[in-house]
Amino acid sequence: MWSIENNKEEQTFIYWCKECNVPIIRTEQQEKKCPICNHRIKKLTTDVRPVFPQERALVEILANKDGQLMDASVWKGRITYYVNGEPLKIPSKVLIDANAEEIKAKLKHRTYTYKSFNENIAKYIEANKEHLQEITKEAHKYILDESQTYKESDIMISFSGGKDSTVTADLVVYALKGKKIKHIFGDTTLEHDLTYEYIERLKKNKEIEIVVARNNDNDFYKMADKIGPPSRMSRWCCYTFKTGAVNRTMNKLFGNKHILTFYGIRKNESLTRSKYNRTEDKAEHKKIANQRVCSPIFYWNEFEIWLYILANKIDFNDAYKLGYSRVGCWCCPNASDISELLAKIYMSKKYDKWYNFLVDFAKRIGKDEPENYVKIGAWKSRQGGQGLPEAKSVKLINQNCTVQENGKIYELTKSINDRFFKLFIPFGQVIDGDSTIKEKLVLDSRSGVPIISIQPLNEYKVKIVTLNVKNHHTLHTNISHQIIKHNACKQCLKCEGVCQFNAITIDKNGYSIDENKCRHCQMCVSSKYIPGGCLMCRYLRTKKESR
């Protein structure tokens, strides 16, 4: 938490009141007594969340504690459950080996009562109300301070449908009451069914505006079929189906304006996010440029998120009631074992389709035991394009020209067309050259001097000569990036997001650059912004090619 009084971040811990049977949040310096009964409290862990009756029923089945948890005070830490303050662990092997169909059948006959749950939650809110008031006050102040210089029309909320963005949105809407702030929902097309239901409920609220950002030019399964399923090391889905789509929507809504975006990012949620700052201005720390990113709940933990939601009776995503700790793409390679089990139980048709796809993929790349490869989650740690035909698209094949200095002959996997020549617009003006060899020349954007000669040799081979430049090697390196784009582009939208002038268009027909909008900044051809010139290099290069 961020302390207003001490103006610094303070570490909090979760304590347990044995008398009231609820968790209480405290810093090391605060008194270790329950504010309800005044009894001493005992340190439990660093963070917990409430376990709803639907999840309790599942835990009873998995832990062989039939009927023992419904009237208990049940909470969950990162891995461990706590029942009336005592730890209960469910081994990962139990989750992996669990029979989803048997569990589903048992859950059908369960009845859920919220009586004891509501009683425990009421005490949880009462025992922690002063803490909630403090963090809410601090968050509101932060939001007001950060938004002072921005117009209402230049402020947005990045909304995922998860608990963190739900709390962030509520804090922002309350702090900026009277203003209608746009909520941009990045629909990856892989959201949980209950997330879509939640978004539909929110659309009925006239006080907020939900804008859906979706990449309609691409299909997840078709792309996964070409470049393999996403993995922890190869999360191509994030940019293709979320960041790129959101960036495209933001460009339509805000143009080149510098905007303020409120995100539901928390420092303790992951190692990656722990390296972020609460307020980000530097482009290298943001997935989407031209915005100031602010995170009101940056110092909050999960305990505080749920305290805010339940105390303020905010509508939230029902997926959390089932046992999800995080709600995002239901088939995410970063999903926990419990999340995968929940998908098998509650989204069985979609899960079966995904499972069959993964098994087929394992067979195609030559895995000896494809079913086991999927069961143990080995696909989640795969890297590169081993076994995939598309891997050849990022393999640059060229040779030095023996008859022309500074010339190289490049082999292509896609035929030469008009869009191929447009890939050279970032280097300068593309004009017709010697018509007898179908040459195109690229004139330097400043001097007007020819710097590149493009000479098609056949449909799949081109000779490119660099002219009148000091560093021919650097220019050929950047040219090779455009060659790889031509061969490998899968419409991931990364290049669209890199271009600050909206000159790049990516659609079902491919990659195109508008010569009237391009400012020749060459960010789109630089490895600084796009490693290897195309994100597919990261996802499809094999170990041999990466050396």
Predicted region positions:
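C-terminal accessory/binding modules appended to enzymatic or scaffolding proteins
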Residues: 482, 489-500, 504-506
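Nucleotide-activated chemistry modules centered on ATP-dependent adenylation/adenylyltransferase
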Residues: 1-158, 163-483, 505-511, 516-519, ...
